[in-house]
Amino acid sequence: MADPSSYRPKPGEIPDSPGVYKFRDEHHRVIYVGKAKSLRQRLASYFQDLAGLHPRTRTMVTTAASVEWTVVSTEVEALQLEYSWIKEYDPRFNVKYRDDKSYPYLAVTMNEEFPRVQVMRGHKRKGVRYFGPYGHAWAIRDTVDLLLRVFPVRTCSAGVFKNAARTGRPCLLGYIGKCSAPCVERVSAEEHRELAEEFCDFMAGRTGTYIRRLERQMTDAAEEMEYEKAARLRDDIGALKKAMEKNAVVLADATDADLIAVAEDELEAAVQIFHVRGGRVRGQRGWVTDKVEAVTTADLVEHALQQLYGEETGDSVPKEVLVPALPDPVEPVQEWLTGRRGSIVSLRIPQRGDKKSLMETVQRNAQQSLALHKTKRASDLTTRSRALEEIAEALDLDSAPLRIECYDISHLQGDDVVASMVVFEDGLQRKSEYRRFQIKSFEGQDDVRSMHEVITRRFRRYLSEKERTGEWADGDLKDGELKDDEGRPKRFAYPPQLVVVDGGQPQVAAAKRALDELGIDDIAVCGLAKRLEEVWLPDDGDPVVLPRTSEGLYLLQRVRDEAHRFAITYQRTKRAKRFRASPLDDVAGLGETRKQALIKHFGSVKKLRSATIDQICEVPGIGRKTAETIAVAFAQAAPAVPAVNTATGEIMEDEEPGTTAGSSQEPVSAGTSDERRGQET
């Protein structure tokens, strides 16, 4: 650990101005970012007697090896720069709110030609309207099912939409009146967009307009003795009112507001947020954070505001934000929120009435969330600590393996050979660190050779990052190598304490040999064989057998199974893309537009394959020479292998070229977040 006096700035060096500062460790990584109204006063507080510092602040300043700062002109600029640096560098000692879960939103993709209503999680996309968050996805689906009677907006995926447009037949929702079926041109793109905008208006809280309009239409229909139409409108009104009843009125003035409450103890804090729109609670979410330094409730509120609104603009930032304590000073934060919204935002503490009552409800939720988290964490932490200790004891390690990486190879009879790397830190999944590999050095089936290649590539990258971050002495750097002074976390910068491979002695030996060839001797290696669940170590003829009730064995099984799942998912994706390749892809000069025209004309690749040259010439834009080239391409191609849904075993029909299960136009299901994070190497 460093002595803070060794890098303390000289007297007079630190300006007495607003600014943002960064602490870096000995490897030049940014470990803490903060802002201050006066840099001189704030930084001086870190270099006082260590005994007087908060324990976690003391750990931070002794871990750091240098400090630097950037002067800004206003406190609002300091707030913006602090947020952007925290997002960029991900400093380990900054307050980080951990979502209790990935909350689902009701999303309307207004950025598409035919907007779609769907459930979405994760990062927000530009051009998409979001409503929520909701506690459960089923709550969104119940609401949408009711509203589709009145606002029959498209809900199908891009693949289903294209297939319906190609065949001229809508999906089931189009037949039962819960979709306006723009895919078969029952309504125009403009009419469908108007429906989507009305859907968004209703979800935004402007409900009275539509209820009154439908009531007038129902009355007019009844007066004209159009009783079936009147009955249908009556049912539509009932559906809208039922959807509204799901969110009781909590604020009589029908305001838009977010209420933030904080419950805390010496080590942790829980934040709860209620999103109120049109006087009704439209969503709720909660976070928990470790208090890495001596922070006040006002500081926690400020961090929560940054987390909530750092990426939001316009109406996503409400007119009113109610908090238990105001940031000090409050003016820069309020000015920043106003800038995000584009109009004045009121940031205040509720004093009386229904807003104070609702704030008390939010506060109770925060207290219950903190109590539940501490109970669960105490149990989980004890179990995880015992599992890591058992692994360390069984493998004769010097300390518990806080970072474990597991590798698995997946292929189908030697085709589409891929590998996965999954990471567990402190016994928990670290999905942002997952990686995927394609085996490049050879073709065919050889798990041992594949394992050697993957381990070599991963740890060669680690050694490269080690050089770039300056972790080796300057004299060890190669000519022309530049040290990376940005301090951002790198993809392969952190080594594990334990490498686990899915397999027995051959795979373990291959992994160990790869590390030895790179000169790495401080990383333990083991393998977990299937069926008997035996743990294999390098150079040991007999496996280590852990008790079946061992928490350590259970953790190793979880790690191994996760690596297997991640690898086989990637392998299936690659296989599906290969199966869906078309001979049309090899026809020179045949662009996407004419491919689509061919598929639309014949209905499928299978029918196109059996067509004559004269029949192909009937397609607009296809001349005889091109038709002959297409016929030759199909004649030379091997018989098409049918694509199979690996989950159900169902043989899938031909689709138009370029459409795959992983198309960027398809929404990714909530259960595959780690596949989205994984990066192909």
Swiss-Prot record:
One of its GO terms (biological process) is SOS response. CDD domains: GIY-YIG_UvrC_Cho. Residues 660-672 have a biased composition (Polar residues). It is found in: Cytoplasm. Residues 208-243 form the UVR domain. Residues 16-95 form the GIY-YIG domain. Pfam families: GIY-YIG, HHH_5, UVR, UvrC_RNaseH, UvrC_RNaseH_dom. GO terms for molecular function: DNA binding; excinuclease ABC activity. The keyword Kinase does not apply. GO terms for cellular component: cytoplasm; excinuclease repair complex. InterPro entries: GIY-YIG_endonuc, GIY-YIG_endonuc_sf, GIY-YIG_UvrC_Cho, Hlx-hairpin-Hlx_DNA-bd_motif, RuvA_2-like, UVR_dom, UVR_dom_sf, UvrABC_protein_C. Residues 650-681 are annotated as: Disordered. Keywords: Cytoplasm, DNA damage, DNA excision, DNA repair, Excision nuclease, SOS response. NCBIfam families: PRK00558.1-5, uvrC. Belongs to the UvrC family. The UvrABC repair system catalyzes the recognition and processing of DNA lesions. UvrC both incises the 5' and 3' sides of the lesion. The N-terminal half is responsible for the 3' incision and the C-terminal half is responsible for the 5' incision. Interacts with UvrB in an incision complex. This is UvrABC system protein C. The lineage of its organism: Bacteria, Bacillati, Actinomycetota, Actinomycetes, Kitasatosporales. The gene is uvrC.
